[in-house]
Every structure is written in C-alpha cells, then in structure tokens.
C-alpha cells in the first residue's frame, strides 16, 4: 500500500503496487463488506468491463474469511480530471474535447446497458476526463448491477430520476439515462 487516495461511505481507496504495477484498491468498511456486495463484485469481475472507459474491478482482496474485503482496479492516470475541476476552471478543455468526452461517456454507458447492467449512481464524482483528448474514465463501478436488481444504491441527489425520488421506480437503465442527461447538461 502506497497511499490513501480517498474515503467515502463504503470504504477507503488506496494506491497500491504489485509486481511493479500500480493499481487502486478499494477496501470496504466492515459494515459495508456484505455478502451481497461480494456477490456483485464476483459477478462484475467475472463478466469483465463493458469497454476500456471503465475502471472495472479486476480481482478480490481478502484478509481472513469473514473479515472485510476489497478489490483492485486500474489506477486513474493523473492527467484525468474531474468534472468539478472543469467547473472550477482547474481544467479548461476545448469545446471539441468536451464534445468528445460527452460522446465517450454516452458510448460507455451504452456498452454497460448493452451487457444488461445499470450503473445506478451517475454523478460528478464517478467520471473523469482527459482535458486534452476528451477520453473518459468511469469509476465506482461497484455500484453496477443487473438491470432491475435490488440493491441499496439509489443514486445521488440532484441526479436521481423523479420516479426514484418519489418511490415509483427502482434504478434502471432508463433512470441512468435521466442521470446522464443531468450530468451532460449541468
């Protein structure tokens, strides 16, 4: 383990090195390291990423049976910036690169939906882009599950479809499209 990269409600993310190769490790807090979460991750690892824009789980990491667990994924290159960086003018892509980023983002989610999955939590915090090329990387893919599956992930306020907020629907490919539209036109 090299350093802590960040922490959230489910766990902490570290940069790690194995065999002279860098990865990111998400380690779940004990209360979020559930059997359901492990089953979701096992499925995602087995199915593989929808396309190259996803920082997809690659392998599970365990301490001891019954203990907390985590997974490794590719480490985001430093030249990729968050959408919040762009809004704060810490990254200033050209209009052409913004259009390419929007294209790559929609193409990535289309590939995800084509595999029968929904993302469930599209928001500023889960997308990074290269301001020089418009390439995108989608992270936090442990939210992903089969379309219509019951999980505890409903989305991020301001990005959630109205039917989720009112309790009339669960997250799905269709509600992902609403969240994606909010993200693209924010």
Predicted regions and their residues:
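Catalytic-loop of the protein kinase fold
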Residues: 109, 113-131
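ATP-binding glycine-rich phosphate-binding loop
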Residues: 1-20
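Conserved activation segment of eukaryotic-like protein kinases, specifically the C-terminal portion
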Residues: 150-167
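Activation of the activation-loop gatekeeper triad in protein kinase-fold domains
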Residues: 139-145
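Conserved structural core of kinase catalytic domains
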Residues: 55-101
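Conserved catalytic-loop aspartate of Hanks-type protein kinases
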Residues: 176
């Amino acid at each position: 383990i090299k350093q802590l990269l960040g922490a959230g409600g489910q766990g902490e993310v570290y940069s790690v090195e194995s065999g002279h190769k860098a990865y990111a490790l998400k380690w779940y807090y004990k209360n979020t390291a559930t059997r359901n979460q492990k089953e979701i991750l096992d499925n995602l690892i087995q199915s593989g990423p929808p396309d190259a824009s996803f920082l997809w789980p690659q392998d599970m990491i365990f301490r001891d049976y019954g203990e907390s667990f985590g997974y490794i994924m590719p480490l985001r290159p430093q030249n990729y910036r968050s959408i919040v960086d762009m809004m704060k003018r810490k990254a200033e892509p050209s209009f052409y690169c913004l259009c390419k980023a929007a294209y790559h983002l929609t193409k990535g989610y289309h590939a995800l939906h084509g595999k029968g999955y929904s993302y469930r939590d599209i928001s500023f915090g889960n997308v990074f882009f290269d301001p020089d090329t418009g390439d995108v990387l989608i992270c936090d893919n442990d939210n992903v599950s089969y379309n219509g599956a019951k999980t505890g992930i409903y989305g991020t306020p301001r990005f959630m479809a109205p039917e989720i907020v009112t309790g009339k629907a669960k997250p799905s490919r269709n509600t992902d499209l609403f969240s994606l539209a909010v993200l693209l036109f924010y």
